[in-house]
Amino acid sequence: MIYLCSDWHLNHDRTFIYKARGFDSVNEMNAEIVKRHNAVVKSEDDVYCLGDCCMGADLEANKKLIESLNGKIHIILGNHCHASPRRVAMYQQCHNVVEVVASAMIKLGKQQFYLSHWPTITGNNDADKPLAARIINLCGHLHTYDPWTDIDKGLIYHVEMEAHNCSPVLLDGILQEFKDKEAWLK
């Protein structure tokens, strides 16, 4: 199985992050994100976190949190990651992290997905083509509660924690949502 998420912001001790998600403390948020993640993700699953995985100077605490997550973790760098080479190095040392990259392309069947931290316009000029011939951008960054926030700009779907009740999203489910809306997307 392939899961996606973005903007865990583990250990980000700012009320505008954890309070907005309905938590009373950063520790409560951390514990609940790990719990919800591990409730659906198994050790053999692939998980793409599309940026801003953790915050704070305590890299060892961040490493322990990431290593407590099930699955083979693929990290797409976010805006908080690029500024911290030490954080990137910590990600690379986590036993369950299999790659740390700026962006990625993956496929599910014939459907291509472009994974990035920031929403990326994949184009509306191919709206006459079938869905399988188009590229879907999966992203984060905005902390939106609506995964379809940018659909007017292209085939863009948000996987932030806020949009999915602080849980990872199954790639098969995302593709099915697009198929269900295919006529509407033209």
Q: Positions of the model-derived regions?
A:
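Core catalytic region of metal-dependent phosphoesterases/phosphodiesterases
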Residues: 3-5, 10-105
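Conserved beta-sheet core of the metallophosphoesterase superfamily
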Residues: 92-186
